[in-house]
């Protein structure tokens, strides 16, 4: 069992056509965030927490912001790819918890939809909560949105990714009998 943590932050975009996406949900009528993909800070934090827990490359290495293949990418699709990589490495997600820091928009009206979309992509429960800044700092001035996430993963006992570990454990067990 392993735990990963992450943090992501994006400034608001100057592009008036860009839509705010948080947790895989569009918030129409709100200024979007700047980024190479859809700039979904909640989903990005979840991705990085899962990758960290499994000891895999971080989101910037897996989905480079210099690679045109990821330009404008839907972050929920990136999350699914990250979970596929996690499972291929022999890990299964147990849960993810994410906290977004922003003053507007309020997440509560869309929280259940965000939770559902993220949980479906991860294949495990994902919780989302929001915190305000009370007007403090850059986020309080409306310069961007931040998110933090923690993820718990466990080894998949049926994965061949850990076959060397299992063989070694078996050898150690035989020496102690």
Regions found by a protein language model. Name each.
Residues 95-140:
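Short, conserved loop-to-beta-strand elements that form functional interface hotspots
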Residues 27-37, 65-70, 135-139:
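A short glycine/serine-rich beta->alpha loop
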Residues 140-159:
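C-terminal edge-of-domain segments
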Residues 10, 15, 19-28:
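Polyampholytic, low-complexity intrinsically disordered segments
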Residues 2-8:
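Short amphipathic
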Residues 49-92, 103:
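Glycine- and Gly-Pro-enriched alpha-helical subdomains that act as flexible
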